[in-house]
A protein has these predicted regions:
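Acidic/histidine-enriched ion/cofactor-binding microenvironments in catalytic or ligand-binding pockets
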Residues: 77-78, 180
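A generic structural signal for well-ordered alpha-helical segments
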Residues: 79, 86-88, 141
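Extended, hydrophobic alpha-helical segments in both membrane/secreted and soluble proteins
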Residues: 86, 95-97, 137
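Residues at alpha-helix termini
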Residues: 22-23, 81, 143, 217
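N-terminal flexible segment immediately upstream of the FAD-binding catalytic core
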Residues: 1-77, 93-124
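Residue-level detector of anion-binding/catalytic polar loops
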Residues: 84-85, 147
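FAD-binding subdomain of flavoenzyme oxidoreductases
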Residues: 115-233
Length: 233
């Protein structure tokens, strides 16, 4: 159950906005109440009902929409320097409240982190930006007579990064596996702005499996920026 009485850190929202506007375009930083209200809900049935009733328990203080990895790095530095909670969010199709800013703070909208996918036929993998919509990637592959063979119910309403963050499954998962099987590896940015890559290499018997460490962590440890997935003919 979500705790609605979590104590928030002390910071001045105006100062945070000013700092963020030095990192991203001013229009990418939003504090208008009606927009914040939209970001205080996802597809969780309780949240959907509260939205209809005009109840906004989990309104963030600011929403920022980066368009590059460089901007994400700058945003996370602002958040760390000012002790502002950060909630990474894709398209908000979660049905259990994962993308709600329960401590207020900042929502990091990753839906605009999208670039042309990179296909490797030799490896039968595709690398895509975390903000890319699942159905867009599948359509892009279909034009090349390829498929992910990964079909969560929210395919058209969720992002690639969201799949990793929530350890998603879907139709055909009984045959081809969940995202833990479909994702070969991914790129991440830690809260201290360290960039790391996990997976994407041949099987090894030395050291821990860092890929498993980040699957399903819902942004607690890092922000996902790119995901490499298996493709099939």
């Amino acid at each position: 159950m979500i705790n609605k009485s979590v104590k928030r850190n002390e910071y001045v929202v105006a100062d945070i906005v000013q700092a963020l506007q030095k990192v991203v375009q001013p229009q990418s930083v939003v504090t208008q109440a009606e927009i914040l209200d939209q970001y205080s809900h996802d597809a969780w049935p309780v949240s959907v009902l509260e939205k209809k009733l005009g109840i906004h328990h989990f309104r963030p203080d600011v929403v920022v929409t980066p368009r590059s990895k460089k901007e994400i790095l700058g945003i996370l530095k602002v958040a760390k320097d000012n002790q502002v909670p950060v909630m990474a969010r894709g398209l908000g199709s979660s049905v259990t409240g994962q993308s709600l800013a329960t401590q207020g703070g900042m929502v990091l909208d990753l839906s605009q982190i999208v670039s042309e996918p990179i296909l490797s036929i030799s490896d039968m993998t595709v690398s895509a930006s975390a903000g890319m919509r699942g159905s867009d990637l599948e359509e892009w592959l279909n034009k090349k007579s390829l498929t992910l063979n990964f079909y969560p119910q929210s395919l058209s309403r969720s992002t690639i990064g969201g799949w990793v963050a929530t350890r998603a499954t879907g139709q055909l998962s009984t045959k081809f596996g969940g995202i833990e099987d479909a994702a070969v590896g991914f790129s991440l940015i830690l809260s201290d702005s360290t960039e790391i890559q996990v997976g994407q290499k041949p099987r090894a018997a030395v050291g821990p499996n860092l890929k498993e460490l980040f699957l399903g962590t819902e942004g607690m440890f890092a922000v996902i920026t790119d995901v490499t997935m298996k493709v099939y003919r």
